[in-house]
Amino acid sequence: MGCMKPNRSIPTATVIPVLIYPDVREAVAWLGAAFGFAERVRIGENHRAQLRVGDGAVILGDVRGDRRPPRPGEATHSVMVRVDDARAHCERARQNGARILTEPTDYEYGERQYSAADPAGHQWMFSETLFDVAPEEWGGESVSSG
C-alpha cells in the first residue's frame, strides 16, 4: 500500500466502507445511539457523513442515482466492528431499536459475535475477542503474503 499522505478530510483507516442511507442525519443519530459511533465530518445538510468507530471509520452517503440501501430480504454486505463486550453492546443496540439477527454466540476461533440490522437494512456484525487461537486449531489456515 505504501505510505499514505495524511489528510484531515478523510479517515485514516485503510479500508473505509461507504454505506447508503435514505436519511444521512437520521442514520448518524441512530448509529451513535445504538452502536456508539461518533460523527467526525459532515458534508452538506444530508449528503454525507464520516463516522469514527474505534480506530476505524465508515462513511454514510445519501440516496442518488443508482446508490441505495439494501432492499428488504437482501444481504449485500456485512460490516464487522470489534467491541470490548459483545453482550453489553447487543443490549445497547436492542434498547435503541436494532433488529438483532443473531444473539451473542461464542465461536471456536476465540470470538463472541452477534449481528444486527439497522433501520436502512445494513447488516452489522460485532465481535469481542475472548482469547487468541491459531487458525489451524479450528480449521483455518495461515497464509503468508509474499
Regions found by a protein language model. Name each.
Residues A120:
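C-terminal catalytic core of tyrosine-transesterase DNA break-rejoin enzymes
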Residues L19-D23:
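Short, surface-exposed ligand-recognition loops at beta-strand->loop->(often short) alpha-helix junctions
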Residues G2-V18, V28-A117, S127-G146:
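Vicinal oxygen chelate
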